Protein backbone atom coordinates (compact mmCIF):
# COMPACT_ATOMS: atom_id res chain seq x y z
CA UNK A 1 0.00 0.00 0.00
CA UNK A 2 1.99 2.94 -1.24
CA UNK A 3 1.42 6.35 -2.73
CA UNK A 4 2.41 6.33 -6.39
CA UNK A 5 1.16 9.77 -7.42
CA UNK A 6 -2.12 10.61 -9.12
CA UNK A 7 -4.79 7.94 -8.93
CA UNK A 8 -7.67 6.64 -6.87
CA UNK A 9 -6.95 5.38 -3.37
CA UNK A 10 -8.48 4.12 -0.17
CA UNK A 11 -6.63 6.16 2.48
CA UNK A 12 -5.97 4.13 5.63
CA UNK A 13 -4.72 5.31 9.06
CA UNK A 14 -1.37 3.77 10.00
CA UNK A 15 -2.37 3.21 13.64
CA UNK A 16 -5.72 1.64 12.64
CA UNK A 17 -5.34 -0.33 9.38
CA UNK A 18 -8.84 -1.82 9.73
CA UNK A 19 -10.31 1.67 9.10
CA UNK A 20 -10.34 4.14 6.21
CA UNK A 21 -10.84 7.84 5.53
CA UNK A 22 -14.55 8.31 4.83
CA UNK A 23 -16.78 11.19 3.71
CA UNK A 24 -19.31 10.48 6.43
CA UNK A 25 -22.75 9.14 5.55
CA UNK A 26 -22.06 9.27 1.78
CA UNK A 27 -23.67 12.68 1.46
CA UNK A 28 -23.82 14.23 -1.99
CA UNK A 29 -24.20 17.80 -0.76
CA UNK A 30 -21.16 19.90 0.17
CA UNK A 31 -19.80 19.88 3.70
CA UNK A 32 -19.74 16.20 4.66
CA UNK A 33 -17.43 15.73 7.62
CA UNK A 34 -14.62 13.19 7.33
CA UNK A 35 -14.27 10.37 9.83
CA UNK A 36 -12.79 6.90 10.00
CA UNK A 37 -14.92 3.94 9.00
CA UNK A 38 -14.46 0.18 9.09
CA UNK A 39 -12.92 -1.15 5.89
CA UNK A 40 -14.74 -3.78 3.88
CA UNK A 41 -13.67 -6.14 1.11
CA UNK A 42 -14.64 -3.51 -1.45
CA UNK A 43 -14.64 0.12 -0.25
CA UNK A 44 -17.67 2.27 -0.98
CA UNK A 45 -17.17 5.31 -3.20
CA UNK A 46 -17.34 7.64 -0.19
CA UNK A 47 -14.21 5.84 1.10
CA UNK A 48 -12.31 6.30 -2.17
CA UNK A 49 -10.35 9.42 -2.99
CA UNK A 50 -9.02 10.66 -6.33
CA UNK A 51 -5.62 12.31 -5.86
CA UNK A 52 -5.02 14.93 -8.56
CA UNK A 53 -1.78 16.87 -9.09
CA UNK A 54 -2.50 20.60 -9.36
CA UNK A 55 0.89 22.28 -8.90
CA UNK A 56 4.59 21.55 -8.49
CA UNK A 57 6.38 18.24 -8.62
CA UNK A 58 8.41 15.93 -6.40
CA UNK A 59 8.44 16.97 -2.74
CA UNK A 60 6.72 20.27 -3.56
CA UNK A 61 3.81 18.68 -5.46
CA UNK A 62 0.38 19.92 -4.41
CA UNK A 63 -2.66 17.69 -4.69
CA UNK A 64 -6.40 17.93 -4.51
CA UNK A 65 -7.90 14.94 -2.71
CA UNK A 66 -11.34 14.49 -4.23
CA UNK A 67 -14.05 12.24 -2.83
CA UNK A 68 -15.06 9.76 -5.56
CA UNK A 69 -18.70 9.67 -4.41
CA UNK A 70 -19.41 13.40 -4.09
CA UNK A 71 -16.70 15.04 -6.18
CA UNK A 72 -15.94 17.50 -3.36
CA UNK A 73 -12.41 18.26 -2.16
CA UNK A 74 -10.96 17.23 1.19
CA UNK A 75 -10.50 20.58 2.93
CA UNK A 76 -8.99 21.84 6.18
CA UNK A 77 -11.39 24.45 7.50
CA UNK A 78 -9.41 25.54 10.57
CA UNK A 79 -6.66 24.20 12.84
CA UNK A 80 -7.60 21.32 15.16
CA UNK A 81 -11.01 21.06 13.54
CA UNK A 82 -12.63 18.19 11.67
CA UNK A 83 -11.90 18.21 7.94
CA UNK A 84 -14.80 18.22 5.50
CA UNK A 85 -15.76 18.31 1.84
CA UNK A 86 -17.24 21.78 1.27
CA UNK A 87 -17.97 23.34 -2.09
CA UNK A 88 -14.77 25.30 -2.57
CA UNK A 89 -12.55 26.51 -5.38
CA UNK A 90 -9.71 24.16 -6.35
CA UNK A 91 -7.41 27.17 -6.08
CA UNK A 92 -8.22 27.66 -2.38
CA UNK A 93 -5.03 26.73 -0.47
CA UNK A 94 -7.00 24.95 2.29
CA UNK A 95 -8.05 22.32 -0.28
CA UNK A 96 -4.46 21.61 -1.35
CA UNK A 97 -2.24 18.97 0.23
CA UNK A 98 1.32 17.70 0.03
CA UNK A 99 1.99 14.02 0.56
CA UNK A 100 5.35 13.10 2.07
CA UNK A 101 6.93 9.74 2.91
CA UNK A 102 7.15 8.96 6.64
CA UNK A 103 8.41 5.37 6.63
CA UNK A 104 7.86 3.82 10.06
CA UNK A 105 9.17 0.40 11.15
CA UNK A 106 9.73 -0.42 7.46
CA UNK A 107 6.08 0.39 6.61
CA UNK A 108 5.57 2.67 3.62
CA UNK A 109 3.37 5.35 5.16
CA UNK A 110 2.87 9.03 4.40
CA UNK A 111 1.88 12.32 5.99
CA UNK A 112 -0.79 14.44 4.33
CA UNK A 113 0.03 18.09 4.99
CA UNK A 114 -2.17 21.06 4.20
CA UNK A 115 -0.68 23.75 1.96
CA UNK A 116 -1.55 26.28 4.67
CA UNK A 117 1.12 25.30 7.20
CA UNK A 118 -0.94 26.54 10.18
CA UNK A 119 -3.61 23.95 9.28
CA UNK A 120 -1.14 21.13 9.86
CA UNK A 121 -1.51 17.45 8.98
CA UNK A 122 -4.42 15.10 8.48
CA UNK A 123 -4.86 13.52 11.92
CA UNK A 124 -7.06 10.87 13.53
CA UNK A 125 -8.41 12.51 16.70
CA UNK A 126 -7.06 11.11 19.97
CA UNK A 127 -5.24 8.22 18.22
CA UNK A 128 -8.62 6.50 17.94
CA UNK A 129 -8.78 2.99 16.50
CA UNK A 130 -12.59 2.99 16.37
CA UNK A 131 -14.94 3.62 13.46
CA UNK A 132 -16.48 7.09 13.56
CA UNK A 133 -13.42 8.94 14.86
CA UNK A 134 -13.09 12.52 13.64
CA UNK A 135 -10.31 13.24 11.18
CA UNK A 136 -8.79 16.63 11.96
CA UNK A 137 -6.34 19.01 10.44
CA UNK A 138 -4.00 19.40 13.42
CA UNK A 139 -0.52 20.67 14.23
CA UNK A 140 2.11 18.76 12.28
CA UNK A 141 4.01 16.37 14.55
CA UNK A 142 4.28 13.37 12.21
CA UNK A 143 2.86 11.21 15.01
CA UNK A 144 1.47 7.74 14.31
CA UNK A 145 -2.09 9.13 14.11
CA UNK A 146 -0.86 11.47 11.35
CA UNK A 147 0.50 8.74 9.07
CA UNK A 148 -1.46 7.06 6.30
CA UNK A 149 -1.32 4.14 3.90
CA UNK A 150 -2.52 4.59 0.32
CA UNK A 151 -4.26 1.52 -1.11
CA UNK A 152 -4.70 1.95 -4.89
CA UNK A 153 -8.21 1.29 -6.17
Curated annotation (Swiss-Prot):
<feature type="binding site">
    <location>
        <begin position="22"/>
        <end position="25"/>
    </location>
    <ligand>
        <name>beta-D-galactosyl-(1-&gt;3)-N-acetyl-D-galactosamine</name>
    </ligand>
</feature>
<keyword id="KW-0430">Lectin</keyword>
<comment type="subunit">
    <text>Homodimer.</text>
</comment>
<dbReference type="InterPro" id="IPR000772">
    <property type="entry name" value="Ricin_B_lectin"/>
</dbReference>
<comment type="function">
    <text>Lectin that primarily recognizes glycans with a non-reducing terminal N-acetylgalactosamine (GalNAc), with a preference for the alpha- over the beta-anomer. Can also bind non-reducing terminal galactose (Gal) residues but with a lower affinity. Strongly interacts with glycolipid type glycans with terminal non-reducing Gal or GalNAc but fails to bind sialylated or fucosylated forms of the same glycans. Strongly interacts with galactosylated N-glycans, displaying highest affinity for alpha-1-3 branched mono-antennary N-glycans but also binding to multi-antennary glycans.</text>
</comment>
<protein>
    <recommendedName>
        <fullName>Agglutinin</fullName>
    </recommendedName>
</protein>
<dbReference type="InterPro" id="IPR035992">
    <property type="entry name" value="Ricin_B-like_lectins"/>
</dbReference>
<dbReference type="Pfam" id="PF14200">
    <property type="entry name" value="RicinB_lectin_2"/>
</dbReference>
<feature type="domain" description="Ricin B-type lectin">
    <location>
        <begin position="58"/>
        <end position="153"/>
    </location>
</feature>
<dbReference type="GO" id="GO:0030246">
    <property type="term" value="F:carbohydrate binding"/>
</dbReference>
<feature type="binding site">
    <location>
        <position position="46"/>
    </location>
    <ligand>
        <name>beta-D-galactosyl-(1-&gt;3)-N-acetyl-D-galactosamine</name>
    </ligand>
</feature>
